[in-house]
Each structure stands twice: as C-alpha cells, then as structure tokens.
C-alpha cells in the first residue's frame, strides 16, 4: 500500500505475493486476478475507475528442475485483458515470473516465448505488456534479439533491480512489450522484497502503429 500511495499506478503487477492473504483492494486498485495453486504467486491489480478486465488467464509454463523437486510454483504467468473505459481500446498486461537461476537460460527463453504466445490467446494482435522477474541478469542482448524476432521489445529499468549479493547483482525485473510506447522504466527504492520494484510509464501506440506491430507477432 505504501508503494501505491507513493506512485499511484494504474496497474500493479506482483510476483512472490502471499496469495492467500491478498486484499481485494489496494487503495484505488482492485484485484483482477491472482494465482491460486501456490502460496507465493502472482497478482494483477487495476484502477477500476479507468479500466475494466474482460478476460484473464493464469498459466503454468514449462517446469524447471527446481519446480519439479521443490514445487514452489505452478503458474508463472497471470495475464489480464483490459478495456480502457474512456477510449474503448483493449490491451493486455501480465505479471510474469521465470524459473530461478538454477535453471538454464534456454528454459527461461522457452518460458518467455510460451508466455507471450499464451497472452495472444486473450486477444490476437492486441497491445501487450508483460512485466516481472525474468531471472535473466546476463546475456540480455541475446534475449532482446530473440524477443524482437517475435515482434516484441525488451526494455530495462534505469538501474539494477537486485543488489543484495554482489555476484548476483543485475537487472532481473524488466518488461517485454508490443504496441506500447515505453516512456521510462524506473527502479524504485527497495521495500520488503529482495528485489527492487520498477515503475513503468507507458502509453498505447496509435491504432495504426498497433496494426503494424500485430502483423509481426
């Protein structure tokens, strides 16, 4: 709630949230969807004075060995299709949490690709913004190229999002998008999580630009 009060976002995406104790509202934001099959999960909140959710998906992705042995997470993606009440335009926002660092980058790339494909089931060609913990602190140029091959852009925040241990410091939390103009992504001061939160300032591309992007997805 302190994070919301300080920055007043229109949408809030959470990872590793205590799903059994999530409130129905955080300030002016309502809960659109959360995972239910694991204690630490994902959630998406939205400003219901501006937006209306029309469809939701909670998706399990290809499992890592960590998932198979310790079983910490079932669903690693929560996607919501929203309608902007003033313009009537639809778009998709998702909260994503990739497999931990014990998994290979190839598995995380597979999860990212699968997640973006799953989101298209909410509305083919719609503007899409997927944010969260990608657990991909190195070789991001390669990841960016792979994402771009599928019609999306990868955007990092202005500072590292994990700083607790020197060896693991880096950008873990960022965004992939299509049909959005990402103005800025700012890394915010650390709260209770070991990851620093990020704040994304983004606007929908024009309908003509979105149509061009949709052809590439």
Model feature map: region roles:
Residues 15, 96, 131-133:
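Active-site flanking residues adjacent to catalytic metal/cofactor-binding acidic residues
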Residues 4, 11-90, 188-189:
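Structured beta-strand-rich core segments of catalytic domains in phosphoester-bond hydrolases
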Residues 6-8, 50, 87, 122, ...:
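Alpha-helix termination/capping residues and helix-transition junctions
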Residues 87-106:
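Metal-dependent phosphoester/phosphodiester hydrolase catalytic core
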Residues 21, 56, 81, 119-129, ...:
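Metal-dependent phosphoester-hydrolase catalytic domains
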């Amino acid at each position: 709630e302190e994070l919301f009060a300080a920055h007043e976002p229109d949408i809030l995406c959470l990872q590793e949230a205590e799903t059994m104790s999530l409130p129905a509202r955080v300030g002016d934001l309502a809960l659109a969807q959360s995972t239910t099959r694991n204690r630490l999960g994902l959630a998406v909140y939205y400003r219901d004075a501006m937006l209306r959710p029309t469809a939701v998906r909670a998706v399990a992705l290809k499992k890592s060995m960590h998932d198979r042995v310790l079983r910490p997470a079932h669903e690693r993606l929560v996607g919501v299709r929203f309608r902007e009440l003033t313009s009537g335009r639809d778009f998709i926002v998702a909260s994503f949490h990739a497999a931990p660092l014990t998994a290979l980058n190839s598995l995380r790339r597979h999860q990212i690709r699968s997640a973006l494909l799953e989101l298209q089931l909410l509305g083919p060609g719609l503007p899409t913004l997927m944010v969260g913990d990608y657990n991909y602190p190195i070789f991001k140029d390669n990841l960016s190229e792979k994402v771009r091959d599928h019609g999306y852009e990868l955007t990092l925040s202005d500072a590292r999002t994990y700083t607790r241990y020197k060896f693991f410091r880096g950008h873990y939390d960022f965004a992939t998008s299509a049909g959005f103009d990402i103005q800025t992504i700012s890394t915010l001061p650390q709260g209770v999580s070991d990851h620093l939160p990020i704040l994304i300032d983004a606007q929908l591309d024009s309908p003509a630009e979105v149509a061009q992007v949709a052809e590439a997805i």
